[in-house]
Amino acid sequence: MSLTGLPDIRKKIGQFHHLRIYKQILSLQGNFARLNYFLGDVFPANLRSASVSVFFEVRLGPRIPDCIVLLKSVDAKDEFAFHCYFFEFKTTLGKSTMQSVHHNCIHQAQYLQGLRQLQQSISFLDQYLIADEVSWNVVPVICFFRQWGLKLDFFKKFSGKTKRLSFSFIRDLFARSQDGAVQSLLSIPNYTNFRRACQKHTDLYRKRCRKAPKSVLTKTSGENRSRASRQVAKNAPKNRIRRTAKKDAKRQ
């Protein structure tokens, strides 16, 4: 099954939850332990003191990975000067597992699409290889989040690839190739305003019901009152109706 066959509303909901994931990552950027936990503990412990840079929806040729986390190692024993993690996020209504990826056609399509995205995004960097530059460890990761509560259900971390790249050039490439609209949304500090802006960005409006014409409303209200009166009379006890009728007859 191809994801292009999904209803547009499902795609828009997925985009909305992607923005929520990005916002959460930004809020945890300064806390290595919490950020690592949120993403499945994919970062090794020796990077605890590394400086962290985060980029979202970076256009790399034909592909746009969801998130790139760049860590500058300060460990003298580390064979890599930089660790670059490419993340592809998938959101699901129900729980996702390795088994569901094999048997659920939608999860499987999401997984395969994510793999292609990661593979082609990382391969794009090959044109910038420089023989005498420092070594990078470039690692692809795919994460499945449940939409309710943004719970990480399942992730897969693949083997890293060693590349020799210029830090200043690649960092600037990532920074200037980010989606400008997404950056503007993520800069909104208030969460309520951020959520509303995300709904607008993804076209997920809470549409209000249109008001009916006054004539229709008046007629409907009158009909409802008449129906209510008939219902009360119908439900009234018969003996009470009879006593009331006798009293009226005596008065006459």
Curated annotation (Swiss-Prot):
Reported induction: Expressed late in the infection cycle.
Cell compartments where the protein resides: Virion; Host cytoplasm; Host nucleus, Host nucleolus; Host Golgi apparatus
Keyword Plastid: no
Stretches with biased composition (Basic residues): 237-252
Region (Disordered): 215-252
Keywords: Host cytoplasm, Host Golgi apparatus, Host nucleus, Late protein, Virion
Cellular component GO terms, alphabetical: host cell Golgi apparatus; host cell nucleolus; virion component
Family (UniProt): Belongs to the herpesviridae UL24 family.
Function description: May participate in nuclear egress of viral particles. Plays a role in the dispersal of several host nucleolar proteins including NCL/nucleolin and NPM1. Since deletion of host NCL/nucleolin negatively impact on nuclear egress, UL24 supposedly acts on this process through its effect on host nucleoli.
Stated name of the protein: Protein UL24 homolog
